């Protein structure tokens, strides 16, 4: 065997090992090797592929590329992806069950080969983006696609490969299409928003936006997960029951949600619906209902389909936070980054116990894709108590409506707007009021310079009446200036002056966060300080040095480098330092012998002595990793009052549960 064949053999060997380790880590939640050992093998594979040019499509190195696509190609599914009919209440569910059981009894009366009375499989209805993954006769993932119309979707193969729990190769020799739901966990959502210049609004948008992003690097940053639940097309695999199909998916290494319940009647189904509704808010991801499907495949074939839906399955929808109302106008707002975004102004409507008058419209592409027009009736949806989003329009209401036009000039300073991808930006960073006001508010925020009492209204007063036109101008304000402002008396003026003075000695990580470096949130700022110790070291760090820091990839690293290349940024920092701002080192050495160093901790319930942010900071200062969900990798669950399902899961897994009192004793 020559040297190149030996290297090819080693590449095959490494791919098999690494894919096995990924399955154990992401699907089984039971890793058998350390991160260090995995990284060692991964680096060996990268080097061998680079040296030989021999790269297999199912290599783990192909999960994340530097690909930026120009468009999404259409893909025709081998078997239709059906929508599900919906039951909004138990009575509608009973009607569905009774209707099907009558059809089955009539079939059995007319045929010798009878069908069994149905049992029903209950699974969660995930609130993400449906994906259809095709594997060829060699078991290799060759296509990933969106649902689209159900017949034709969009090719998102590069994007789905970034989902680390998705197998790139399976031990199956038949052409097969596997369906699932790509989701963003709450943990991944929080972690992404810590670093994001423009935070995500909800989990569903996080998943859907990632998979429909032409820049695969952006998709990878979202750290998506997935659950698979159906085989839509198979040339060689036959199943007698749905449970048998699920067993096959598990055996092939697909991530399958452990909640799968078989029920024999409406009484058992009602009990399960109540159980899922009770634990819904404790889950690490969003669901919007339960899918109820007949288990027996032959029965499914007999029941067949309507024009729109399979008769053998139905979705029980939880009480929806959705409504229909009229779009009156669109308001264009400028953010801290200069991004100009549309907000819908609506006729008032009650939704989830709140009166809704405004809703999110992400950008012009979103407006065009959803066919949103002024005067149209629109569907709005509210998730996790955030500002609602327009999901689409009532087609019948489009007559006599008006097109929404993108502004050509900034709605505040009238500077010409520029297009960057799907977004509009105002480049007038020096005198565009909303940009400067929001920058001042961010700079003064608690996680940044912590200038107590400095609100957005105060920032607007400073801008309009004191001619504050830069961050540095904050430190030139005098008490007599403040006393000229409306509602500023002696005490309030003294408080603001003291707060500004006290902010001059921030933690270095807080100062870094206050600078508004794109993609650098609170955690990344701390990671930078922990690794580089000083501001100058961070400013002068190379791409290699930055990406060697855990959780910092090329996108964040490039953001840091490009930020500190800007002359006006360096001038602003120099100005702040000359005005007396003196950042101090804030990372203390972790005592290696503390009981939480290197451990994974989950916090649940309400603590008496700490807010969620405070306990997270405390644990991270002790060297712990704070996770949002309980798994076999969890070392401790810190439980406060009204601890929920995380407490129960910890009990099931035998994970040590500690009270707040025990925690305080352990750290002291």
Swiss-Prot record:
- Domain (BRCT) ranges: 591-668
Cross-referenced Gene3D superfamilies: 5' to 3' exonuclease, C-terminal subdomain, BRCT domain, DNA ligase/mRNA capping enzyme, Helix hairpin bin, Nucleic acid-binding proteins
- Keyword DNA repair applies: yes
Cross-referenced SMART domains, in alphabetical order? BRCT, HhH1, LIGANc
Give the record's keywords alphabetically.
DNA damage, DNA repair, DNA replication, Ligase, Magnesium, Manganese, Metal-binding, NAD, Zinc
One Gene Ontology BP term is: DNA repair
Q: Which residues bind Zn(2+)?
A: 410, 413, 426, 432
Residue ranges spanning the membrane: these are none
Query: Superkingdom, according to UniProt?
Result: Bacteria
Q: NAD: present as a keyword of the record? A: yes
What EC number(s) would the UniProt record show?
6.5.1.2
Q: Which reaction does it catalyse?
A: NAD(+) + (deoxyribonucleotide)n-3'-hydroxyl + 5'-phospho-(deoxyribonucleotide)m = (deoxyribonucleotide)n+m + AMP + beta-nicotinamide D-nucleotide
Annotated positions binding NAD(+): 35-39, 83-84, 147, 181, 317
> Which residues does the entry assign to the active site, renumbered to this chain?
125 (n6-amp-lysine intermediate)
Which EC main class describes this enzyme?
Answer: ligase
Regarding protein family, the annotation reads: Belongs to the NAD-dependent DNA ligase family. LigA subfamily.
Biological function = DNA ligase that catalyzes the formation of phosphodiester linkages between 5'-phosphoryl and 3'-hydroxyl groups in double-stranded DNA using NAD as a coenzyme and as the energy source for the reaction. It is essential for DNA replication and repair of damaged DNA.
Q: What is this protein called?
A: DNA ligase
Give the gene symbol: ligA
